[in-house]
Amino acid sequence: MKIKIALEWFLNPDHLPMIAGLVTGKYKEAGIEVEIIQPKEHYDGFEDLKAGNIDIHCNEPLHLYEHHFEGIRSLGCFFETRGGVMIRADRVEKLRSNEKIKITTPASNPVTNKIGFEIIKRYADKNGFVIDKENVEFVEKDFWHLKNMKEDESFDGAWLCFYNFEGIEAKLEGFENLFIDQFESPYPNFSALEFMSTQSTIEKKGDAICKFIEVTNEMNKYLKNNPIEAQSIYYDYTKEQKNILMDSIILDTLIRLESEIKVDALRWRELYCFLEELELVKLNEQEYAKIWNTSHH
């Protein structure tokens, strides 16, 4: 049976579990034909999921709430990293002085900007200084955070950074920074990827989806134990030129793969409360409970 899965952005090492399932032929052995679709925009997958054009979408868990629609279901989280706002080391003083700061982000909209500011604000509260909302400007660029900061000195930082990407890249390049994640600022982490589907898809393809999760679970375990093999699987599939940065990103990504992909109603509960507090989402108890009521899986 065919399973169409849409990613949240371009193919990268976060998606290694699925890449491995394809390269090793394990999905095929389990009787499922998996097709990976890369989106044009970060949120494309939700429209496709709702319309039934795809069977599974992977995206950050906050979108289960923020892009909630009747029938959306979680299939479990397969990867979690540290994430947040990266500030150039030499601009931290500027931040502390409540001066105007400019931040590059792949998505500048009221929701992501509000979350980005809240993370900085909580960091400020924790460290005893004040930051005004009007002093933080989010400018929409693309996902190449470090490149954008290097090419444009006016950027003081970047928002929507994953440590296994930007953190590793900055470390390799000697780009000094303050990485404001959930350890620096008290907020619930959501830099993770969750498999999502819909009730109607689960009713139609429940067995195939179960198989998909089963094989992907196996791949996670295999990759974590075989880092060199994981690198060659990645290069084999993407046809990218082997390089030190990608090697390092892959190694850091592997330690962040989940040992077991499972539906967990409590895992992102605190995240839901955080988003509700920011008046970004509002679900009743029944709507919340239904997200995790993936009966067939």
Predicted regions and their residues:
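Pocket-lining segment of extracytoplasmic ligand-binding domains
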Residues: P61, E151-D236
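Conserved C-terminal helix/tail region of periplasmic/extracytoplasmic solute-binding proteins
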Residues: Y272-H297
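Short, surface-exposed acidic
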Residues: G128-E137, L178-I180, T238-L251, V281-Y288
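Short secondary-structure capping/turn micro-motifs that flank functional sites
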Residues: I37-Q38, Y43-G45, Y65-E66, E166, ...
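Secondary-structure end/capping motifs
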Residues: K205-L280
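Internal, conserved structured core segments that host functional sites
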Residues: K141-K147, E153-F155
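Short, glycine-/small- and polar/acidic-enriched structural segments
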Residues: K2-F138, S154-F162
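Alpha-helical segments flanking ligand/cofactor-binding loops in enzyme cores
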Residues: F46-E47, Y65, K147-N148, I168, ...
